[in-house]
Curated annotation (Swiss-Prot):
It comes from Toxoplasma gondii. One of its GO terms (molecular function) is magnesium ion binding. Its cofactor is Mg(2+). Pathway: Carbohydrate degradation; glycolysis; pyruvate from D-glyceraldehyde 3-phosphate: step 4/5. GO terms for biological process: glycolytic process. CDD domains: enolase. InterPro entries: Enolase, Enolase-like_C_sf, Enolase-like_N, Enolase_C, Enolase_CS, Enolase_N. This is Enolase 2.
Length: 444
């Protein structure tokens, strides 16, 4: 048996310059590293990301307490354990070493989901090496998936930013392109990159050079006023790139960010202080707006169209457009099996956004994915806006056979390292894999 010999944790910086946790896990087979991401628009039901709150350092965002928890609590308990026992190690960290719970399950508020996840991911890499497998194949075995014919995902590139990710007036957070008409991941990434480069030219011509600055996830944030303006830019870029018909559109609305709790309305002008309230919409009005957009543009997926507790509006929209358009829960579900069960019962959505740091372990991420797939949902594996050079989710999406991933624009190294890893995986698999393409919601 291979055993864990040592664990070293440290504070590093993510793509926004904020501290995050990195772990080196040592076995007889070598040293295995993992670093965790963090989000800007976070759902209130996510597992706890432990921050130091010392305002004299990194504006309170240090993670030295999480690092200390790894060294003092997690490491002594894991020395000598078999890294191939992923479930056992995750369970030990979550239920015994941490042990904190809320109504939605294990919340990791003692040790921090960032501490637990870093160790969980490093352990997964060590387990793969011990079994002599590439990480994606090892994850497939953990999930009980076949390893003979793998599925390469459709990449959803976030190329125009609004919402909390941008300084423009657009309420919706992400406008994405999805090259479903490609035949390989390599071709899909090429199409995505070409549309992105043409979009840059289109934006520069219309709004000037400074409009091509990029946001946290590599997308552009031109000074546009609303969703239709953003979508028209996308359609123009797709057209001039010569990829019409091969590229569909998706959006992450992140509606919880502009839901006014007291008035129970959505404010599409939420970034203008003391605005005239003319852009406020009820759940029903917002639903009708989405339906209009879906008729006008080639939408295949809409994420977080309503507030994270507005199960009713979700269910109505899913009922009305869900066959043609995937309705994805992110803040609604926070990769949490208990929240997924509730959404299944209420028929609230038909897609899960899978973010490993929302739930905090590899095992629970696999469980959430399997629960969604069992209920015939789509599953989109996702990065966070604060990322690192760790490409774990590229292997995860192939291992879990979800057929779809979003990890930013084809720009900025912390995004590209995931796309580049997907191309490497496809190359190593050769004819033993297929591109999910138009069937990305239910890849066979």
């Amino acid at each position: 048996m291979v055993a864990i010999k040592d664990i070293t944790a440290r504070q590093i910086l993510d793509s926004r310059g904020n501290p995050t946790v990195e772990v080196d896990l040592l076995t007889d087979g070598g040293c295995f590293r993992a670093a965790v991401p963090s989000g800007a628009s976070t759902g209130i039901y996510e597992a706890l990301e432990l921050r130091d709150k010392d305002q004299t350092k990194f504006m309170g965002k240090g993670v030295m307490k999480a690092v200390e928890n790894i060294h003092k609590i997690i490491k002594p308990a894991l020395i000598g354990k078999d890294p191939c026992d992923q479930k056992g190690i995750d369970k030990l960290m979550v239920e015994e070493l941490d042990g904190t719970k809320n109504e939605w399950g294990w919340c990791k508020s003692k040790l921090g989901a960032n501490a637990i996840l870093a160790v969980s991911m490093a352990c997964c890499r060590a387990g793969a090496a011990a079994k002599g497998m590439p990480l994606y194949k090892y994850i497939a075995t953990l999930a009980g998936n076949p390893t003979d014919k793998m599925v390469m995902p459709v990449p959803f590139f976030n190329v125009i930013n609004g919402g909390s990710h941008a300084g423009n007036k657009v309420a919706m957070q992400e406008f994405m392109i999805a090259p479903v008409g490609a035949s390989t991941i390599q071709e899909a990434i090429q199409i995505g990159a070409e549309v992105y480069q043409h979009l840059k030219v289109v934006i520069k011509k219309k709004y000037g050079l400074d409009a091509t600055n990029v946001g946290d996830e590599g997308g552009f944030a031109p000074n546009i006023s609303g969703a239709t303006e953003a979508l028209d830019l996308l359609m123009e870029a797709i057209k001039v790139s010569g990829h019409e018909g091969k590229v569909k559109i998706a959006a992450d609305v992140a509606a919880s960010e502009f839901f006014l709790q007291d008035d129970k309305v959505y404010d599409l002008d939420f970034k203008t202080p003391n605005n005239d309230k003319s852009q406020r919409k009820t759940g029903e009005e917002l639903r009708n707006l989405y339906k209009d957009l879906c008729q006008k543009y080639p939408f295949v997926s809409i994420e977080d169209p309503f507030d994270q507790d507005d199960f009713h509006s979700y269910a109505q929209l899913t009922n009305e457009v869900g066959e043609k358009v995937q309705i994805v829960g992110d803040d609604l579900l926070v990769t949490n099996p208990t929240r997924i069960e509730k959404a299944v019962q209420e028929k609230a959505c038909n897609g899960l956004l899978l973010k490993v740091n929302q739930i905090g372990t590899v095992s629970e991420s696999i469980e959430a994915c399997q629960l969604a797939q069992k209920n015939k949902w789509g599953v989109m594996v996702s990065h966070r806006s604060g990322e690192t050079e760790d490409s774990f989710i590229a292997d995860l999406v192939v291992g879990l056979r979800t057929g779809q991933i979003k990890t930013g624009a084809p720009c900025r190294s912390e995004r590209l390292c995931k796309y580049n890893q997907l191309m490497r995986i496809e190359e190593s698999l050769g004819s033993d894999c297929q591109y999910a393409g138009a069937g990305f919601r239910h890849p066979n």
